């Protein structure tokens, strides 16, 4: 019997894109991209709720990188913003604020 894994379309915000592009640590970028790739296949890995519906993807590298995202059905995931453990509370507030103003179409 064939098995079909779910796939999710990943979308990003300009805030996430700017944060990711500005990361100086190439190893961190590769690890974060690998986690995003796994997320697109339905495997979120290490995560924690950041207050429904925002989810915090935890990357155990360097200062403890975080990527905040929201899932919409089985179709796509929006990466809202990123940061690290030192900016965690501000990043969670920013993710919720972005979500309130995000066009989910």
What is each PLM-predicted segment?
Residues 13:
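PIN/NYN-family metal-dependent endoribonuclease catalytic core
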Residues 34-61:
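A short, surface-exposed loop/turn module that caps and links secondary-structure elements
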Residues 1-9, 18, 26-29, 44, ...:
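Enriched for short, Lys/Arg-rich terminal
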